[in-house]
Swiss-Prot record:
Gene Ontology MF annotations: DNA binding
Region named Disordered: 94-152, 393-438, 469-510
Biased composition range(s): Low complexity: 123-143
Any Gene Ontology CC annotation: nucleus
Protein name per Swiss-Prot or TrEMBL: Global transcription regulator sge1
Keywords of the record: Nucleus, Transcription, Transcription regulation, Virulence
Protein family (similarity comment): Belongs to the MIT1/WOR1 family.
Biased composition (Polar residues): 471-480, 501-510
Main localization category: nucleus
Taxonomic source organism: Verticillium dahliae (strain VdLs.17 / ATCC MYA-4575 / FGSC 10137) (Verticillium wilt)
InterPro entries: Gti1/Pac2
Amino acid sequence: MSAANVPLEATWQGHVASTLDAVVLFEACLSGNLRHVPRRPHDRERQDLIQSGQIFIYEEHASGIKRWTDGVTWSPSRILGNYLIYRELERPFPPGEKKRAAKKNKKQTNGGISKSEGCLRQNTGMNGTATGANAANLSSAGSMDPSEASRNPERALIGSLVDSYPFKEGGLVKKTISVQFRSVPHHLVSYYTVQDVMSGALATPTSHSGFLRNIVPRPELILNQNFRAPIDEVDVDDNRLIQHPLSSAHQEYVNHMHPPTFRTWSVPHVNMAVANPRQWPTSMVPAQQQQMPPPQHAQYLQTHPGAMAAPMPPPNYAQPSTHHPYAYQDGVMRPQVTTSSTLAPDVYRNMLVDQPLSRRHSTAYDLSNSSHAIGLTQTMSNNPVDPIRNMSHPFMQATPVYGNSGRLQEPVQHSDAFPSPRTLPQQEPGLDGSQQHSASLKLEGEESHLQHNNSWGTYDVAATHDVFLGGTNTDQSQPFLNPEGEEEQYDENNPPPTWPPGSNNSMGRL
């Protein structure tokens, strides 16, 4: 038998008073406790199916229903919370006439509810006086405040559809709502009359004593919807909302998605003076620091001993150490440079050098028998040369080991590690009578010094290579050539720079 020949039945019978009632019915259909309707009612079925208390839920894709039709003449829709409501009209509108609301207010409508009476009931306080603010809210043609509707059950059933159109006396009210689950729209259509709901003939899903009482909607039906009003809207009875399992299920879902976290340590207030926390009074220590619950992962670490957890270190409130970048020495302020010798003077002396180390050093010269040791003379600080920095030290003479030792060549033996010293030509005095640029290189004992005289003073610089500072020697000079090889022309007042023989003056290098 095809679906068109199967008798159509309503999904449930009752009344949906709140968004929570509709969500419970949607969940019952998704879980298989209730069934979706596969099609719209036929013309012959409308008289029996479109009755007060009938609720139909259909899936848009599976049923192919784009628009629900029931053959009843309805008024324009109005918003009531998350629902759209319609009221049955006494007669349909003439063809081509717009569905305009009546301008003048009638004392009694065909539906049995007067707008003036409804406003009076809505805005009447405990002392019988009316408030103008509430009356202004109720006069809007759109949605009505759910809190106001909870105090007036009649207004909660029809919203603002009071006397705007020629409503049918004792006619039906249609209430619709839609949700999306996994990108599939699901629609609910409910029919009721004001008299049946007011008399208590129609029950709600949340107050049902049967299987619907234990239906808990899934979080997607609540959190992933574009509802105008929140799910805990005020038009739901507080007792029903608290007793329904949704309240506890929603709280468990929130706790699961956003678990509470604990701070392992806390810092003092921004206005509090930073000092040692041990010196703080008990009243000034934050409460979270005085009493802290155990971490949540403690039980996991006990169960899994192999798991590692790096605790967060407490803040360091100690005063930072003061560093002096300059120090007085020999009556002159000199910058204090931190080296490895100043940090740990005994590190290198305590190292074991019995066995050869796999370090790569130059073996071009054998300095074991040479009196000239390579090292930097610390003339600035007047400190003795560290023995470990001497190339004749056994630590520096360790044999390098890289793979096969047979491939290494024997070091070249030289009688003298450096050529004989030479004296640089003396420069002529400058215009002011001082030696502007004069330098001489000489070797004295085991140290090689470069004595440099200028207008500011004389100082010694340790030298291990030939150094030449340009001057104005006219005896051994060469003309300055530009990169093209041409001789530069200078006037008599501005003589050209000269270079010693053998130097590459075209590149301007020493």
